[in-house]
Structure formats: structure tokens, C-alpha cells
Regions:
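NAD(P)+-binding Rossmann beta1-loop-alpha1 motif at the extreme N-terminus of oxidoreductases
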Residues: 1-56, 115
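Rossmann-like NAD(P)-binding element
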Residues: 16, 41-48, 59-122, 129-130
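Short amphipathic alpha-helical segments
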Residues: 22-25, 50-51, 106-109, 134-136
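N-terminal alpha-helical segment
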Residues: 53, 105, 154-158
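Rossmann-fold dinucleotide-binding core
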Residues: 121-174
Length: 174
């Protein structure tokens, strides 16, 4: 896999950080044709994220930061759903942005690593939990790393990539 093969990006966790990561990816990835899936197992979080996305895009258009056509493109390429397994199965790159609880993260990574494509890249947005604490529950730890967005993710231009001892050089290069 190379960077051109990345077509579908899934962000798991529709809290404030997950929403911003997904929107940032959808807006900045539109020139690359990314499809972005923001998912959360809690329906209430999905509803809030959908409402937030609509409001955010409308505001960007009103301020002249996006054209109406660009906002429509983002809407067409940003799916917000409660189907975490479906999102994981479709994604080429998965960014986990759920609660900072190691047990919950390990359960999620164990589940999604069995569902995702064999060459999918798995990442955690955590700044507190290194990917090496998740590697042993994944099917392919060489495709796992930390991708740490700084808050607020929609404003900050900095994303930290942290390679674990299990992470392949190829994964970092993509």
C-alpha cells in the first residue's frame, strides 16, 4: 500500500476531538478524494456530531472560508454513523479517538483489527497511551502507530506521528 491507495479514512469516536479530526480530514482531503467515516457506537454522539458538522460547514461558507460547492463535496464524502464495524471494514486508515481508557481501547483494537482490511493502518490519537500497549491485541501490529492531533485539530497544523517498536517503516512512510 502507498499513500495513493488511501481512499477511506475512518475516525472512531465522535466526541469533540473525533469530530474535528474527521472534519479536518474531509476538508483537507477533498483534493485527494478521501471518503471519511466518523463513527461512534453511541447514537447520541452520532446525532450531536451530525448536527455539529452541518453547523460547522454552514459557518465556513458564511465566513467565505469554503464555497458552497466545497461544503457540499465535504458533506457527500463525510459519513457519520454508529456502525463502527462497518466503518472499520471499509477503511484504509483508521484513527481511534475514543475515551482515554486502556481497557476500552484494547477491546476496540482487538475487535477492529479482525474486521479491517489486512493492509489497513490502525492508529490511536492518544497522547497518554502508546501504541505498544495495543500492539499485542492487533492482527498486524506493524501497521499500528500513534497519530496525535493537537487540540483544536481544526486549527492546529501539527500532527505527531509516533512509531512504536512494532511499527514498520513502510507504515510511517505512507
Amino acid at each position: 500500500m502507498n499513500a495513493q491507495d488511501l481512499k477511506t479514512i475512518a475516525v472512531i469516536g465522535a466526541g469533540a476531538m473525533g469530530q474535528q479530526i474527521a472534519m479536518n480530514t474531509a476538508i483537507n482531503g477533498r483534493k485527494l478524494g478521501y471518503n471519511v467515516i466518523l463513527c461512534d457506537s453511541f447514537e447520541k454522539a452520532v446525532e450531536k456530531a451530525s448536527a455539529w458538522a452541518d453547523t460547522y460547514l454552514k459557518g465556513r461558507v458564511e465566513k467565505g472560508r469554503l464555497t458552497a460547492e466545497e461544503a457540499d463535496f465535504v458533506k457527500q464524502h463525510l459519513t457519520i454513523t454508529s456502525d463502527v464495524d462497518g466503518a472499520a471494514a471499509k477503511a484504509d486508515f483508521i484513527i481511534e479517538a475514543i475515551i482515554e481508557d486502556l481497557k476500552v481501547k484494547r477491546e476496540l483494537f482487538q475487535r477492529i483489527s479482525r474486521i479491517c482490511k489486512p493492509d489497513a493502518i490502525l492508529s490511536t490519537n492518544s497522547s497518554n497511551i502508546v501504541s505498544s500497549k495495543l500492539a499485542d491485541v492487533t492482527e498486524n501490529p506493524s501497521r499500528l502507530l500513534n497519530v496525535h492531533y493537537f487540540n483544536p485539530a481544526l486549527v492546529m497544523k501539527l500532527v505527531e506521528l509516533v512509531k512504536g517498536p512494532h511499527t514498520s517503516d513502510e507504515t510511517i512512510e505512507i
